[in-house]
Amino acid sequence: MPSNSASERSTTIPDRTPGELVVVTGMTGAGRSTAAKELEDLGYYVVDNLPPSLLRDVVRLVDETRGTAQPIAVVVDVRSGSFFQTLQANLAQGATGRHATLVFLEADDDVLVRRQEAARRPHPLQGGGRLIDGLVRERGVLADLRGDADLVIDTTGLNVHQLTDRIADAFGTPDTVRLKVTVISFGFKYGIPVDADFVADMRFLPNPHWIPELRPRTGRDAAVADYVMAQPAAAEFLDAYVPVLEGVASGYLREGKRFMTIAIGCTGGKHRSVAMTEEISRRLGEAGYETRSTHRDLGRE
């Protein structure tokens, strides 16, 4: 188990400069892939499962092809084995020519066991033994790296969103930390999405289902979308609702929230909600938010 004193290490990172190098390592199941994905979203060039002996070559290649200002993140795991000595030497000597930050992710053994079992994957060091045996070996192999880490994050009590927030707090800038908005369509007859922050009901709009030529189509088809958006009530709704969402989104960012889910429903989740989801996603994207639209119940009827 990680000690309390180490897991409470400050998460304050020294002032960052262009061309930073972040090295992510830590325990299997502690969230390395999640951290890497967030760093990629923050503009880092990410290399996963890199043998430390190739670190200088990767930095040189990125410098030559993308410029020295391109931040780089590399993920190194226990499968690199004895190469860890090379990594420590490179970081200690500044051999890459970049300011390097070493991030170590860990969690309590019982949490790591649950995560690995849920993923149905063996531990790379467990061999023919138990999963816990692999974790014990891994802690031993990584002990020195953990001691050298600039940032230790204990993910025992963190979910995916909370871990990405921690990474963004450490390595993001106002220009790179953006609110991620998901707009999801659904059918009320299948239930409201449980993770929705906002729910809007489109059943006040005329239903294309009752128009024979539109019935087999969906809200992603231009004919259906045009029909829905041509309704005066649809325009009134958008003009009133989207500014509210923009105001809330700005508040979310001020409060450190980085995810917002907006659910748009109609009877079956095929016509009205789908068209409105696409339009709201488009408008929020034009307002500068990172948006994606998804249609939970499309094709379910």
From Swiss-Prot:
UniProt GO molecular function: ATP binding; GTP binding
Superkingdom classification of source: Bacteria
Transmembrane segments: none
Key words of the record: ATP-binding, GTP-binding, Nucleotide-binding
Binding site for ATP: G26, M27, T28, G29, A30, G31, R32, S33
Residues annotated as binding GTP: D77, V78, R79, S80
Family matches, as InterPro entries: P-loop_NTPase, RapZ-like, RapZ-like_N, RapZ_C
Pfam families named among the record's database cross-references: PapZ_C, RapZ-like_N
Disulfide pattern: none
Signal peptide: none
Summary of the function given for this chain in its UniProt record: Displays ATPase and GTPase activities.
Database matches in NCBIfam families: PRK05416.1
Record HAMAP family: RapZ_like (MF_00636)
Similarity field: Belongs to the RapZ-like family.
Name recorded for this polypeptide: Nucleotide-binding protein Noca_2527
The species this protein was found in: Nocardioides sp. (strain ATCC BAA-499 / JS614)
Native organism taxonomy: Bacteria, Bacillati, Actinomycetota, Actinomycetes, Propionibacteriales
